[in-house]
């Protein structure tokens, strides 16, 4: 059962929308803008990066979702970690993550990025990039398809739309 406040808000919204008005909250507008203008930065480490390139190509066209790949971490708000993360590469991943401006999100793509994958028991592999950076969305598969990546990005957009306020930090420790 919905709260009476939300029911009144819905009734008012319906009445005004019939007359050509739009009634919204600033949080909703900010969430909509953030979700529909993601600028991902690729951190392609292995074969999952090929699927990521396929998702950005003309057949799937991630640009239609408002996503534009950026070469610099200072210009991007989404990091897609695709592939096997080694112990030598982990400090570089953390450094790039720290250079990103807030709000920032991380998407872990593939079994290797999620938990080490096929190389889980190797001495040189980090068993999941979530040990180095906080991850918002996990995409399973070896390698995951371009459709799975786009589905994961759409789930991230839903998550971003649910956030409120100007500052986003779901990883606060108390």
Swiss-Prot record:
It is an enzyme of class 7 (translocase). PROSITE patterns: COMPLEX1_20K. It is found in: Cell inner membrane. It catalyses: a quinone + NADH + 5 H(+)(in) = a quinol + NAD(+) + 4 H(+)(out). It is a peripheral membrane protein. Transmembrane segments: none annotated. The keyword Cell division does not apply. It comes from the Bacteria. GO terms for cellular component: plasma membrane; respiratory chain complex I. Disulfide bonds: none annotated. Signal peptide: none annotated. InterPro entries: NADH_UbQ_OxRdtase-like_20kDa, NADH_UQ_OxRdtase_20Kd_su. One of its GO terms (biological process) is electron transport coupled proton transport. Gene3D superfamilies: 3.40.50.12280. [4Fe-4S] cluster binds at residues 47-48, 112, 142. SUPFAM superfamilies: HydA/Nqo6-like. Pfam families: Oxidored_q6 (PF01058). Its cofactor is [4Fe-4S] cluster. Its EC number is 7.1.1.-. Binds 1 [4Fe-4S] cluster. PANTHER family: NADH DEHYDROGENASE, NADH DEHYDROGENASE [UBIQUINONE] IRON-SULFUR PROTEIN 7, MITOCHONDRIAL. NDH-1 shuttles electrons from NADH, via FMN and iron-sulfur (Fe-S) centers, to quinones in the respiratory chain. Couples the redox reaction to proton translocation (for every two electrons transferred, four hydrogen ions are translocated across the cytoplasmic membrane), and thus conserves the redox energy in a proton gradient. NDH-1 is composed of 14 different subunits. Subunits NuoB, C, D, E, F, and G constitute the peripheral sector of the complex. NCBIfam families: nuoB_fam (TIGR01957), PRK06411.1 (NF005012). This is NADH-quinone oxidoreductase subunit B. The lineage of its organism: Bacteria, Pseudomonadati, Pseudomonadota, Alphaproteobacteria, Rickettsiales.
């Amino acid at each position: 059962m919905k709260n009476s406040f939300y029911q009144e808000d819905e009734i008012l919204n319906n009445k005004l929308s019939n007359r050509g008005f739009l009634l919204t909250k600033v949080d909703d507008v900010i969430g909509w803008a953030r979700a529909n203008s993601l600028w991902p930065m690729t951190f392609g480490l292995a074969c999952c990066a090929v699927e990521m390139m396929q998702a950005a190509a003309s057949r799937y066209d991630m640009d239609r979702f408002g996503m534009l790949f950026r070469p610099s971490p200072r210009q991007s708000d989404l990091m897609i970690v695709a592939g096997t993360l080694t112990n030598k590469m982990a400090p570089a991943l953390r450094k790039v993550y720290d250079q990103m401006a807030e709000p920032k999100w991380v998407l872990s793509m593939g079994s290797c990025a999620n938990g080490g994958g096929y190389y889980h028991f190797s001495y040189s592999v980090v068993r999941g990039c979530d040990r180095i950076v906080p991850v918002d969305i996990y995409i399973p598969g070896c390698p995951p398809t371009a459709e799975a990546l786009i589905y994961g990005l759409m789930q991230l957009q839903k998550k971003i739309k649910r956030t409120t306020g100007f500052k986003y930090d779901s990883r606060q420790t108390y």
